[in-house]
A protein has these predicted regions:
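Ribokinase/PfkB-type carbohydrate-kinase core domain
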Residues: 1-20, 34-168
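Divalent-cation-assisted or electrostatically stabilized phosphate/pyrophosphate-binding catalytic cores
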Residues: 27-34
Length: 168
């Protein structure tokens, strides 16, 4: 099976450590890092998950600009203390004219609403793909999904769409 993943991606950095003392110049804890883990995130995470499921032929089309999400995590409890996002918006650099959609068994759209894909881009992907999946954070109505085979939404995104007046 050959799968194409299209969407926003980032670098996820997890800095694990602990807080054993308070800062002398402000009433905040001092974080002491002990380990750093770096992963591909968003659309990159979709690729990693597909490969973990045994899909070996996976291509990705994603943003050129680097988005970084750095999470500071207390290593004993695994509690996230802080997340720092860098370069959270990217340009719409997607060019569907160079994609042979027929050569893919399935297309996955991982749209995190960071700017890489427009509504028009996503609509075109749904129309041109044989088997298509979409996970979007955009506020949309039900007509937006009519060309997609599968739709994945979190409750927050669902509620935003319903609040917009979508008729489901």
């Amino acid at each position: 099976m050959k799968i194409l993943v299209i969407g926003d991606s980032c670098t996820d950095i997890f800095i694990y450590g602990g807080c054993q003392r308070m800062c002398p110049e402000a009433p905040i804890p001092v974080f002491e890092p002990s380990k750093t883990v770096t992963n591909d995130g968003m659309a990159g995470n979709v690729v990693r998950n597909l490969k973990a499921l045994g899909v070996s032929d996976v291509d990705i089309i994603t943003n050129r600009e680097q988005i970084t999400k750095t999470r500071y995590v207390e290593d004993k409890s695994n509690q996230m203390l802080l997340r720092v996002d860098s370069n959270d918006r990217v340009s719409n650099s997607f060019n569907p004219s160079k994609i042979d959609f027929e050569s893919y068994d399935a297309v996955v759209v991982a749209d995190y609403d960071k700017g890489f894909l427009t509504y028009k881009d996503i609509d075109l992907i749904g129309k041109k793909s044989k088997l298509s999946f979409i996970d979007t954070k955009k506020v949309v109505d039900h007509n937006y999904f009519e060309d997609f085979t599968f739709v994945k939404m979190n409750e927050v995104e669902w509620d935003r769409c319903v609040d917009k007046g979508a008729n489901y």
